[in-house]
């Protein structure tokens, strides 16, 4: 009975598209819920920030579609805390203009994906995303519905990006776009002019990530030799159960991280040099403010949360499903930039480079022999870059996962160099 009442409640919250233009501090775009499943009325929330001096209805500037990272996390954290959008939020929940926004030269769309994240609403239990192919299809359906409503938005180059666990879905989404495009012609409804992917601190192949924690902790002085050996034991247990019993492997992974937190913490796993959480502003106060919810075309009864635990739980079995083969195939047809944050423990630089080295891509040998160069912004070395054919890898120095919070200019410069083919030297 309680489950039936919950289903009725969800249906009552969002039953039709709510999206429309918004204007906050003079920053304009479109936002709201798009009903993806016409039978159950499950919906995804998006907000699209127009390029600061552009008009998405008339120009041809690129569109960057960004997916949330983290397990059950909202896209609003990426857009607002990482300084991707033209807005950021202070500790009182007030919005301010961000002059380092990526929207200076491109349009930015963020999506609360999958269902249940942020403002997005599932209406039936059957709509919860529990596998990657279904998630990719739901996202493509969402894009196709937007394309039907706003065809001009998609008459341009499209890039899809995200960090962390977004790496589980983005290669599958790109692969499905490529497959669908094969049956269509450019300009035809459903054809998406995908040009490239951007993957930050990406969780593509868990087996190449988990087995680095002992080495990374030891090399960074977070563990001594004895503690490193304990971590190795934990890792072997995780990896030994990853395929046969992913639930058990996930529990073991949590125990491994808890052990690291005990010996080296309390540790900020996405920026190990900080011993407290990143200050991302009071997003909940802003996003649950009735005035701003109304402006963003969010149904009044919908409540925003930074992380949705039920979504996180549903995704646990996906952690150990490698997307390396899918990404390898995508690389044959699209350019891909992978970047790594130096101080992210959870998906550390060793892990990201192992993920790359283990790609079964035809160009991997040429990439690994390509020159690695210093990456400079305004004359300062901010990282290193290595590129060959369709693959670019950027190592960003002195930052954790939320790069834009501490280095707002550098990630924008990196994105622009990749999208606009500006070169690195």
What is the predicted function of each stretch?
Residues 2-425:
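Terminal and linker regions of secretory-pathway proteins
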